Amino acid sequence: GKSTFLNFLKALFQENVTFNTNEDFRSQFNADWAGKLMIVVEEVLLNRREDSERLKNLSTAHSYKMEAKGKDRYEVQFFAKFVLCSNNENFPVYIEPEETRYWVRKISRLGKDDTSFLQKLQDEIPAFLYHLQHRNLTTKEESRMWFSPSLIRTEVLEKIIRCNRSRIELDMTELLLDIMDTMPV
């Protein structure tokens, strides 16, 4: 599942990909990942508002302060994309209702377990790269995140946003729905 997909990305983009943990993302020391093309997290749980703000900032930043332990910070170009995977469908990351920087997808399991699936994917990398180089794009740039917000507004994203509401708001919604169901109209 998640590991196979992320290992495929690593095989595809090689040294331009780094695996991070939630703690790596929260650390002030970022020299090992700030210069990468892709930052992947296998079991993401970044459900604090400050995590969300940092992700939002980084997803549109053109430059970023890189910092290594015991060294001065310095500014670098920042162009990384984040791939965050999780089995937690309700609350893997805090997402505000009008947010347009996340494209959340639910990926179904394969029909059967195939222990050589990663190797099969890796064997197809040359053909896959050829396809990417020679295909026509089907979308035009429509926003700062390229895609139209309506294209990336998925049911799974909506579910996460609903689960991100405060406990009081969720309880009030449930109470009002119960009242509406029991009242004769």
Report residues per predicted region:
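Feature primarily recognizes SF3-like P-loop helicase cores of small DNA viruses
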Residues: 4-185
